[in-house]
Structure formats: structure tokens, C-alpha cells
């Protein structure tokens, strides 16, 4: 009885995996792989490679020790913290921890 139940569950899961279709909204992003099933394509899209964390140039870099990086950098004390601001290169903006 249990073997029959397990067989029917496995058969239904296999049937459902064959019926899985790519969603139309993501069909352009997924592309077409000739040997891969649609479920494998979705899984490969979700399990992508490592995400690069880029330092935004608009925000401040938070550091314990701040220093001037070029001759145009200047230091300002605001709200009890020291900030380094730069007119020529906004990547030089720093904030004290």
C-alpha cells in the first residue's frame, strides 16, 4: 500500500515537472538552452554567480581613520563627526565611524 502511494506521488511530481513552462515575462531573460528543461533554466537564473558589491560614489565611505586623498579634499565637522569632502573627485568622500 505504501509502495503504491510513493509510486503515485513520484509519478505526479514527474508529470508536473514536464508541464512546467517558462513564464512569458522572463522568456527573453532566460534564453533558450537546447538540452536544458525549463525548470533547470529558472533554477540556473536564480542561482547566479557571486554578486559584486560596488562602492557607490554618491555615498560616504565609513572609516575609522579618515585622511585627505588629494589636495582638493577638505575636512568638515558636522553632527559630531568628521567628514572629508572633495570638489574634484566625489569618490574621496569619507565619514568617520
From Swiss-Prot:
Pfam families per UniProt: Ribosomal_L36
Family of this protein: Belongs to the bacterial ribosomal protein bL36 family.
GO function terms (MF aspect): structural constituent of ribosome
Alphabetical keyword list: Mitochondrion, Ribonucleoprotein, Ribosomal protein, Transit peptide
Annotated protein name in UniProt: Large ribosomal subunit protein bL36m
GO CC term, one of those recorded: mitochondrial large ribosomal subunit
Signal peptide stretch: none
Classification of source organism: Eukaryota, Metazoa, Chordata, Craniata, Vertebrata
Keyword presence, Ribosomal protein: yes
Protein's organism: Rattus norvegicus
Localization of this protein: Mitochondrion
Gene Ontology terms: biological process: translation
Amino acid at each position: 500500500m505504501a509502495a503504491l502511494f510513493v509510486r503515485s506521488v513520484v509519478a505526479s511530481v514527474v508529470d508536473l515537472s514536464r508541464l512546467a513552462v517558462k513564464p512569458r515575462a522572463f522568456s527573453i531573460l532566460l534564453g533558450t538552452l537546447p538540452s536544458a528543461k525549463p525548470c533547470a533554466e529558472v533554477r540556473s537564473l536564480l542561482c547566479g554567480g557571486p554578486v559584486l558589491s560596488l562602492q557607490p560614489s554618491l555615498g560616504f565611505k565609513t572609516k575609522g581613520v579618515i585622511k585627505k586623498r588629494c589636495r582638493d579634499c577638505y575636512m568638515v565637522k558636522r553632527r559630531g563627526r568628521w567628514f572629508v569632502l572633495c570638489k574634484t573627485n566625489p569618490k574621496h568622500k569619507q565619514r568617520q565611524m
